[in-house]
Structures are given as structure tokens and as C-alpha cells.
Amino acid sequence: MGQKVNPNGIRLGYIRDWRSTWYADSSRYATKLNEDIKVREFLHKKLAAAAVSKIQIERPAQNAKITIHTARPGIVIGKKGEDVEKLRAEVHKLMGIPVQINIEEVRKPEIDAKLVAESVAQQLEKRVMFRRAMKKAMQAAMKSGAKGIKIMVSGRLGGAEIARSEWARDGRVPLQTFRADVDYATAEALTTYGVIGVKVWIYKGEILPGQIAEKKNNKKGAK
């Protein structure tokens, strides 16, 4: 029986970049890793209403640079940037080093796996039928330019006595092609019957080696 590896992890260093980019020796590595986990947990909790897709952390010298990818940048920034300044001060307390926070807008939340998974989970919490929630998310993704999408929900679906898994797919989702740009994310719906797990795979097309090199060069130029 075949086992499915995490689509993000298997593509790291090939078409995916790490979400924490820093170096530490063995004595400091665990401390910095724990800091990253705490910062991410804090930001996801604090910005629950801001539709946060991912958080990237860089540590140049004795500083930290945090990039928040969100579908609602206005909620994160606040009036005249007040909210982002408060956020920077709170993260500075957690990390103990100067922190710079950048906000990047997610232009198409319909084809962002994390945001789609959270949207389906929120609908399940509001007692929307799981098939309807899945169908709506898939239609929106395909309209926004996705080449394929697969959604799986697991748990006591519709309040059933026995937990089960149901999935639906539209288009194609190649999991074994490394150059295939497959975005993968999970979310949890906390319902009165228990926890329902949501998994989302979104295929956006292929990224060829030339495009990867170009992307890396553009990144270096921006720095």
C-alpha cells in the first residue's frame, strides 16, 4: 500500500524554499527553533481574522525579519500602521532582538491551500454540509486559475456515529512530479461532534528549472 509524503517537504530545496532561513550552531539551534514555533503560534492566534497564509522568518545578524503573507493586509496593518507597530513590539518581547515586520498580500486566496483549508473548516464549524463546502471551494479554485484541486475531510461527518474520510477532486493533482507546483495544507474544524480534519492539495502548474533559477536571482536582487 502506497504512503503519501508531505508534498511541501519533498519539494524543499527544489521548487520550494524554507519558511525559516537562518543558521545556528548546535548549542543555539533548539532555542531558535522553539522561538520560531512560538512566534508562529502567537501570530496565527493574534491574526486569526486576517486570513494568514504563511509566515517567513529570517535572522540577518542579530535581528529578525518576519514576512506575513495575508489575504487581508488592512487588518494586520491597522489605522496608520498602529496595529503592526504593536505587533512588532510584542514579537520583540518574545524574541528579545530587534524585529522588522513586512506584510505581503495574497492576491488569489482561492488558490492558497492554507486559506482554502481554513475556509472549509470554518464552514464545517457553522454546520454547512461538508460536500457543499468542498464543492464551493473547488469551483472557486478552478475559476481562479488552478489546474487541479483535491480536498479530503475526515471525522464524524454530519454527526455520524462512525468516523470516516471523504474526498473530492477536480482537475489533476500530480503528487509524484517534483516540478509540479502543488500547494498543500491542513486545518481542523472544532465541531460539537468532535474534530474534523481538512486536507487540501492545489496544483498550479509546473515550475521548470530555468524559472526556479530566475526566481532565486530576483530574490537576491531584491535584497
UniProtKB/Swiss-Prot annotation:
Gene Ontology MF terms in the entry: mRNA binding; rRNA binding; structural constituent of ribosome
Its lineage reads: Bacteria, Pseudomonadati, Pseudomonadota, Gammaproteobacteria, Thiotrichales
Query: What HAMAP family does UniProt report for this protein, alphabetically?
Result: Ribosomal_uS3_B (MF_01309_B)
CDD domains from the entry?
KH-II_30S_S3
What family is this protein classified in?
Answer: Belongs to the universal ribosomal protein uS3 family.
Whom does it interact with, and what assembly results? Part of the 30S ribosomal subunit. Forms a tight complex with proteins S10 and S14.
Sorted alphabetically, the Gene Ontology BP terms of this entry are:
translation
List the record's Gene Ontology CC terms alphabetically: cytosolic small ribosomal subunit
Q: Please name the source species.
A: Francisella tularensis subsp. holarctica (strain LVS)
**Keyword annotations from UniProtKB, A to Z:** Ribonucleoprotein, Ribosomal protein, RNA-binding, rRNA-binding
Source species, domain of life: Bacteria
**Physiological role:** Binds the lower part of the 30S subunit head. Binds mRNA in the 70S ribosome, positioning it for translation.
Q: Does the keyword rRNA-binding apply?
A: yes
Q: Which residues form the KH type-2 domain?
A: 39-107
Q: What is this protein called?
A: Small ribosomal subunit protein uS3
Q: Which Pfam families match?
A: KH_2, Ribosomal_S3_C
